[in-house]
Amino acid sequence: TGGLLPPGSFATMTRVVISGTGLYRPPHVITNAELVEAFNAYVGLQNEKNAAAIAAGSLPALAPSSVEFIEKASGIQQRYVLDKSGVLDPTRMYPRFQERPDDQISLMAEIAADASNQALAAAGKTGAQVDAVLCASANMQRAYPAMAVEIQQAIGAGGYGFDMNVACSSATFAIEQAANAVRAGTATCVLVVNPEITSAHLEWRDRDC
């Protein structure tokens, strides 16, 4: 409710809740043993390539890794990825993603739609009940058009939608915007989705990354 309140009255605060959540899990697993094998092969190739510079002292030799090193440093035992072959290729060590035609849903929107449908099911809602979609990510697949619009189409939502990029705090800012929209009455059911392809962010060739 907008406007000025008469003296002695109290504003009724709209209660905002998170009614459902969903989580997309990539289809492929890379174990520490697999990653170490690929990384150490990369180290061998690089040290061989730069042998003269390493011998002259102008370039340090790359150090190999181990399963024990990874687990002690991070506690990580395995990770889920969208593409496994590219990451484990010692001559590449980053994922391969095929460009999709414009008439297909984008990769990040597909991931987001999967998690969104899980969240809707958990909340007991349908896409038609969603009147705003906020797609928040630290690293967007593209600048425009908004992936939120693709997500709307994929789940059958109407209303409005837009993308947000606030680096590592994108999701928290989106949750705040969603809560504010409900409190302001511009939306009654807001979907916040945070698709991140983190395997494409990492420098797999850096042992300490």
Language-model regions, residue ranges each:
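Intrinsic, low-complexity polybasic segments
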Residues: G2-G3
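Conserved "HGTGT" condensation-loop signature of ketosynthase/thiolase-family condensing enzymes
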Residues: P6-Q129, I155-G156
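Acyl-thioester C-C bond-transforming condensing/cleaving domain
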Residues: P6-T12, G44, S106, N117, ...
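Short acidic/histidine-centered micro-motifs embedded in hydrophobic/aromatic stretches
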Residues: A73, A136, V193
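Short glycine-rich or small-residue beta-strand-to-loop segments that form or flank ligand, phosphate
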Residues: D131-A138
